[in-house]
Amino acid sequence: RLVAHLRKKKFKVGVVKHAHHSFDIDHPNTDSYKIREAGSYKTTIVSEKRLAHIEEKISPEIDIEELIKLNEGCDILIFEGFKKIKKLSKIEVNLKKNNKELLYKSFDNVKLLVSDDMSEHPIKVLSHDQVNEITKEILSDSF
C-alpha cells in the first residue's frame, strides 16, 4: 500500500528487496537465460516497457552505495529486508500474530514501528492503515 500511495503522490519509488536465498528472475529456454547460464557476468533484458538487469555477484558483501547508484532517478528508495545494515533508517513492520522479537530493541536506527499492537513503545507506532502518516514520517527530517 505504501508504494501505491507514494506513486499516487507522483513520487518515483524504487524498492530494493533483500533475498535470503538464491533466486532467479529469468526463465529457462529463453535466450537471456541461456546466455547467463553460459557465463555472462551481466545480462540486461529490455523491451518497450521494461528493463531487467541481472548481475552475478562476486562478493557476498552488500554495498548500499552501489544499490543506491543502480536506482538513480528515484525520488524515494525503499530497502526491504536489510535489517543488519546500520546506515539505513528503518521502519519496522511487526504484527502481533507473528510473535517476533521487536527489532527496535536491538537496533537504534529503527525510527518507526508499524504494527497492530498499539500499546506503548519508546518509538512512534502507526497502524498499517495510517499510510498518510507513514508517508509524512518518511518525508520528515528524522529519516
Predicted regions located by residue number:
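Charged helix-capping and loop-helix junction motifs
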Residues: 29, 60-63, 97
